[in-house]
Regions:
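Short, surface-exposed linear motifs at loops/turns and structural transition points
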Residues: 1-171
Length: 171
């Protein structure tokens, strides 16, 4: 069954017996960052989309870099794709992610995520009940400080390297 995408809904190209079309939400339902020994994006997909793949690209100092997410499940059993090798030096890079079904057809519009936009959204998110907003702000500030230190280290190691005409120091 061919699928196409309109607004935020994936639609079947063939109507059902009653003349209506099957409409599903976008396969990608959330994106987040996991920080542990390393950093990764975690992309949750809607139930029923665990048999597909998630491809991504970003444009860095070495041009366009492409990759494919690794599928797994979280502790609640949700299907999660992970994009590894995300690091503070790439905090300002925009990753463009696209879900593909098992047949290789792109489903839904591409989505964009970056470390900085994730934390901007996290910072501006409405506080939950009994949440310590100051702790959230401190976490974000500490993480951005960590990113800045990593950028300074990159500048020391690669002073002439540029991205979009900007050195590590400028970025």
């Amino acid at each position: 069954d061919d699928k196409y995408f309109a607004d935020k809904l994936a639609c079947s190209a063939t109507p059902n017996a009653d003349g209506y079309y099957t409409v599903k939400d976008h396969p990608i339902i959330s994106a987040g960052i996991s920080i542990g020994e390393d950093m990764s994006f975690r992309i949750m997909v809607e139930e029923g989309y665990e048999n597909g793949s998630l491809k991504y690209y970003y444009i860095g100092v070495n041009g366009r870099v492409e990759g494919e997410g690794t599928i797994g499940t979280d502790t609640q059993g949700n299907s999660i794709f992970r994009i590894y090798n995300v690091n503070p030096q790439r905090a300002d890079l925009i990753y463009v992610i696209q879900y593909y079904d098992a047949d290789g057809n792109a489903i839904g519009a591409p989505k964009e995520i970056s470390v900085l936009t994730y934390f901007e959204g996290f910072y501006n998110m409405e506080a939950g009940k009994n949440e310590d907003v100051e702790a959230r702000k401190t976490f974000i500030a500490n993480f951005l400080e960590y990113c800045a230190s990593a950028m300074e280290r990159s500048y020391a190691d690669f002073p002439k390297e540029t991205l979009d005409g900007k050195t590590w120091q400028y970025r």
